[in-house]
Amino acid sequence: MPATSLEGLVTNSGWTINKLIKNTSGSGGNFCTQYEATSPEGKTGFLKAMDLSNALNSGSLEVLQRTVSEYLFEQEILNHCRDQNLSKVVVPLDSGSVINPNFVQPLNQVYYIIFDFAEGDLRKEYINKEITSWSKVFRSLHHVGVGIKQLHNVGIVHQDIKPSNILCFANDESKISDLGRVTDDKGKSPFSQLTFTGDRSYAPVELHFNAIPRDDFIDRRYSDLHMYGSLIYHLISGVQLTPILINQTRELMSNAPLTSYEEALPFLKLAFGKMMEEFYNKCEEEFGEDISSELHEIVKELCYPDYKYRGNLKYSRKVQRLSLEKYISKMASIQRKTYITGIN
């Protein structure tokens, strides 16, 4: 395929495409290839190339239009985030197309986007191996909260906040990546008709009962809040929140079918309360009472099973209740406390 043989080519902007890293399935099911790339100034970047050959070979104009639409939207939303100076979101260094001389038109044109080269992601750094620095974990989680808030402030909801989508860079900086399936308040996203666009295994529990709130665009923030709290829970406990919650709820119901969200909600709350008690005890053992109380409050409010009572209940208006300001502040406070108490 054209996108798998770009090594040695140079883009119009001067980036040299170096070694191939891997092939992946892109956000819209398109075939993507990842490379290291070097700028004219010697900066190392990460290049994601999109191969349109699958869409072209399908013989379907609809498939081709959808594929191009998804790519153009991702490029547009990334450029928008860059222009808005979203410091905790991964934005492009360059984008465009490169001609592969080994193929004929139109297959020879390969679209690409280049990003800063990351050192890893939260899954590789903190889940797949033993955590050696909790202060770095909390710093990363603070950055994630800031990144989600930045997206919300410019009318974007991510809905796929998970460890592999949080990239780690030099100087212990973390940023949110993979904006290919986000939705926006202007309705430009090709995925606007979907109530949830991310990984279902990390999704809030209401999704599993087809009870996702859908009255207003801001309701999509319920998912981002839950996924942020779930990320905190995952990094500390080592397990994903939603699958455990569903399993424990089924045990409470003696494995009877969970027919509706409303019927399951009392059992979900009971199971969630037990999980939060266990989470608090684990945090207290690891970090002490003060920090564990803050972490318990954050996760409980962000992941509460009844989404109508999720977020900062001090406020009744959604724009304030679904704001991450309180939780960003608390994560900053936890960072300071780990430093003061000598927790590494």
Predicted regions span which residues?
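ATP-binding glycine-rich loop module of kinase domains
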Residues: T33-H80
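Conserved HxN/HPN-centered segment at the entrance to the catalytic loop
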Residues: E76, R82-F103
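Conserved short submotifs of the Hanks-type protein kinase catalytic core
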Residues: V104-D121
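Activation segment signature within eukaryotic-like protein kinase domains
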Residues: S140-L141
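Activation segment/activation loop of eukaryotic-type protein kinase catalytic domains
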Residues: F169-S201
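Conserved C-lobe activation region of Hanks-type protein kinase-like domains
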Residues: I218-S223, I232-G288
